[in-house]
Amino acid sequence: MEWEALVERARGGDLIAYFGYGSLVNPATHRTNVLHYERAQLRGFKRSWQERPDVGTEPVALLSSAPSSRDDLLDGLLVFDFSENLPLLDEREYGYDRLSVTPEDLKLYDDKALPEIPLYVYSGRLPQKVDAPHYILQSYLDAVMQGYLHQYGEEGVRNFVERTARFDTKLFADRASPRYPRYVSLSESEQYLFDQVTSFMSTV
């Protein structure tokens, strides 16, 4: 959808936007009728890997964000969607709190003015108890890094790794048999790049 048409559509009061900083940066993982997305930067949040014992039957770590210093900046994707899809989005982001953010917290990369609609970001709830070491599914990480590659180039992938805390979490190499439900297909060059930038990680 063209930007002018989106702004006009927003006046109807049935649109929302949410900031993606992990798998949502990759449009191939979107499962609702998304209208539009824009590269954006969120101020005042940090990203890290977080144990998620509440998800599925295996001890996975997923990306989370949390409010932090106003000096902290996250690159990501601002996704414009219908407000009626919020229940589906909340279901996808099970175990995350949907936080409201303001236009002052968000900056589009081409300096477009944001329409007056509700703006959100999802922040993972801290687990009450962690009984075992958790790991990162490579199929999940691939989806995230492909999103950053397509939106921000190779530098964006490297910045994602450098600016995400707890990347010492171990990797579970499931690329050949993906366990992440919204896994993506990679080109040979993407596989090479992603393996290169994560070569420091230990595997389980």
Where in this protein do the model-derived segments appear?
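A glycine-rich, hydrophobic/aromatic-adjacent loop/helix-cap motif
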Residues: 1-204
